[in-house]
């Protein structure tokens, strides 16, 4: 597997080539994903729930993400590695730069931050200082207490239009990837079409340029809850490597997510 860069993903978008991504948290699973040539991995703050047993992502720290970023980088030297910026680690642009530097030194190629156009100055400051950014829109789990739970975002026209404007503003500020979570497929398609940068979806239909799943959902080992948009690929294959290969193949062909795993 060759070393992946953002330029590869931009080229794939231009060519109409879809790609699959996953969360990862340790060297062993990162090595498994690399063996199947998974192009992008995310050290997600979802580790707070799937590894630490918390009820949400808010307790996760920069140090937690940095530790797991080092582990994943050791197992997958060639993936494009994104690292989540945890809750309140980017409240100001200056704070974001300091914490992003920690994650980049740990082996990340890009940081992911949650929020809309209020992050424009932060994205500008990060990218001007050589930190690539993935902007996360839609259901942003760090805002669970504002949303009143994990709910689909962008159903009404006003909120959908706002999300499109946010995506364009963040792209203009320098974001090189946009991640959409739990938004109607029609809205995800609209955003994917208007942006030049790659769009990765989770619970956002199959029109986005890429898809991402939480690793534990892909293997059917999440403790309490399987989201509608997730699929247990291990149950169908009985082998983790085959499960990853099937997930990637179904994303690349457009077979996943199908209607049963899509939010209308």
UniProtKB/Swiss-Prot annotation:
Binding positions (3-methyl-2-oxobutanoate): 45-46, 84, 112
Active site: 181
Enzyme class: transferase
Biological process according to GO: pantothenate biosynthetic process
Pfam families for this protein: Pantoate_transf
Main subcellular localisation: cytoplasm
Cellular compartments per GO CC: cytoplasm
GO molecular function: 3-methyl-2-oxobutanoate hydroxymethyltransferase activity; magnesium ion binding
UniProt keyword Hydrolase present: no
Source superkingdom: Bacteria
Entry note: cofactor: Binds 1 Mg(2+) ion per subunit.
Keywords for the protein's UniProt record, in alphabetical order: Cytoplasm, Magnesium, Metal-binding, Pantothenate biosynthesis, Transferase
Residues holding Mg(2+): 45, 84, 114
Cofactor(s) essential for the protein: Mg(2+)
Catalyzed reactions per annotation: 3-methyl-2-oxobutanoate + (6R)-5,10-methylene-5,6,7,8-tetrahydrofolate + H2O = 2-dehydropantoate + (6S)-5,6,7,8-tetrahydrofolate
Localization in the cell: Cytoplasm
Pathway: Cofactor biosynthesis; (R)-pantothenate biosynthesis; (R)-pantoate from 3-methyl-2-oxobutanoate: step 1/2
EC number of the protein: 2.1.2.11
PANTHER family: 3-METHYL-2-OXOBUTANOATE HYDROXYMETHYLTRANSFERASE (PTHR20881:SF0)
Assigned protein family: Belongs to the PanB family.
Subunit structure: Homodecamer; pentamer of dimers.
Record function comment: Catalyzes the reversible reaction in which hydroxymethyl group from 5,10-methylenetetrahydrofolate is transferred onto alpha-ketoisovalerate to form ketopantoate.
Entry protein name: 3-methyl-2-oxobutanoate hydroxymethyltransferase
Annotated gene: panB
């Amino acid at each position: 597997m060759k070393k992946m860069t953002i330029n590869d993903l931009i080229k794939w978008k231009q060519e109409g080539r879809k790609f699959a991504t996953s969360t990862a948290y340790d060297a062993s699973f990162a090595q498994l994903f690399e063996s199947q040539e998974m192009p992008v991995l995310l050290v997600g703050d979802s580790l707070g729930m799937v590894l630490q047993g918390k009820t949400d992502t808010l307790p996760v720290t920069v140090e937690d993400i940095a530790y797991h970023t080092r582990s994943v980088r050791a197992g997958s030297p060639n993936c494009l590695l994104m690292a989540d910026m945890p809750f309140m680690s980017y409240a100001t642009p200056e704070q974001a730069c300091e914490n992003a530097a920690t994650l980049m030194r740990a082996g990340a190629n890009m940081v992911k931050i949650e929020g809309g156009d209020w992050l424009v100055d932060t994205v500008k400051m990060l990218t001007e200082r050589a930190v690539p950014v993935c902007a996360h829109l839609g259901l942003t789990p760090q805002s669970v207490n504002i949303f009143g739970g994990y709910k689909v975002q962008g159903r009404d026209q006003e909120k959908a239009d706002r999300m499109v404007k946010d995506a364009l503003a963040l792209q203009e500020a320098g974001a090189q990837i946009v991640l959409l979570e739990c938004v109607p497929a029609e809205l995800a398609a609209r955003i994917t079409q208007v942006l030049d940068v790659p769009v990765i979806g989770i619970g956002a239909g199959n029109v986005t340029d890429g898809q991402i799943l939480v690793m534990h959902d892909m293997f059917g080992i999440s403790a309490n809850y399987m989201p509608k948009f997730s699929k247990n690929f291990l149950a169908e294959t009985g082998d983790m490597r085959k499960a990853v290969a099937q997930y990637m193949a179904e994303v690349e062909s457009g077979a996943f997510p199908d209607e049963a795993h899509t939010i209308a």
